[in-house]
Amino acid sequence: MLSPKRTKFRKQHRGRMRGVASKGNTIAFGQFALQAQDCGWVTARQIEASRRAMTRYIKRGGQIWIRIFPDKPVTMRPAETRMGSGKGNPEFWVAVVKPGRILFEMGGDDITEEIAKEAMRLAQYKLPVKTKFISSDKNLEVSSQENTKNNKESQEEVKQ
């Protein structure tokens, strides 16, 4: 499972999850991706379970990139412990996920959109956040359509 090799401090505050992801919100490596729709903590176990589900489905077909890393320690106190006597020990690691963050990417010559969609669907079931499937091809098509509209408008302005 994923966890940092070493950290500056053993324990962290829980923090708040406000706003949307400003980094890691575009497809960088593959053609298909799984994007978070709401905020939450994704544990190292959930990331590993999702990775296994996708890998089993695509077999040796393509490549999977994990775009999140669990770098936040979550501490817990033992059961039936009295109040006080300090903060508990780190029990597991989580990745803080905000809306718009890309969680996984998939690509390769053998990977079709149907295969990628089904593999990502299997991974979605393992995650505690709402997600959606996105494709880099569609993003390119949308931007190219917007560019052609802008070009037509500018040509009409030049004619007048």
Swiss-Prot record:
Residues 149-160 have a biased composition (Basic and acidic residues). GO terms for biological process: translation. Residues 138-148 have a biased composition (Polar residues). Pfam families: Ribosomal_L16. Residues 138-160 are annotated as: Disordered. GO terms for molecular function: rRNA binding; structural constituent of ribosome; tRNA binding. GO terms for cellular component: ribonucleoprotein complex; ribosome. Part of the 50S ribosomal subunit. Binds 23S rRNA and is also seen to make contacts with the A and possibly P site tRNAs. This is Large ribosomal subunit protein uL16. It comes from Prochlorococcus marinus (strain MIT 9312). The lineage of its organism: Bacteria, Bacillati, Cyanobacteriota, Cyanophyceae, Synechococcales.
